[in-house]
Amino acid sequence: MAKEEAIEVEGKVVEPLPNAMFRVKLDNGHTILAHISGKMRKFYIRILPGDRVTVELSPYDLTRGRITYREK
């Protein structure tokens, strides 16, 4: 997925799932499955339920995404 094609949206982590997956409720009301980006995994950034996150969505599958940023 090229960086230019990704759709960036914000949401809130609802629940953690196995294999570093999370259920995220987006600000527009949709709920998606998201995994942690490689840089966040590399630097051991912890994501807990209730955290505000930025998610990149692929234009091909809007039900799955990649968490790229956790707000402080």
UniProtKB/Swiss-Prot annotation:
It is found in: Cytoplasm. Keywords: Cytoplasm, Initiation factor, Protein biosynthesis, RNA-binding, rRNA-binding. HAMAP family: IF_1 (MF_00075). Belongs to the IF-1 family. Transmembrane segments: none annotated. Pfam families: eIF-1a (PF01176). GO terms for molecular function: ribosome binding; rRNA binding; translation initiation factor activity. The keyword Plastid does not apply. This is Translation initiation factor IF-1. Its main location: cytoplasm. The keyword Transferase does not apply. InterPro entries: NA-bd_OB-fold, RNA-binding_domain_S1_IF1, S1_domain, TIF_IF1. Residues 1-72 form the S1-like domain. It comes from Syntrophotalea carbinolica (strain DSM 2380 / NBRC 103641 / GraBd1) (Pelobacter carbinolicus). SMART domains: S1. One of its GO terms (cellular component) is cytosol. One of the essential components for the initiation of protein synthesis. Stabilizes the binding of IF-2 and IF-3 on the 30S subunit to which N-formylmethionyl-tRNA(fMet) subsequently binds. Helps modulate mRNA selection, yielding the 30S pre-initiation complex (PIC). Upon addition of the 50S ribosomal subunit IF-1, IF-2 and IF-3 are released leaving the mature 70S translation initiation complex. Component of the 30S ribosomal translation pre-initiation complex which assembles on the 30S ribosome in the order IF-2 and IF-3, IF-1 and N-formylmethionyl-tRNA(fMet); mRNA recruitment can occur at any time during PIC assembly. CDD domains: S1_IF1.
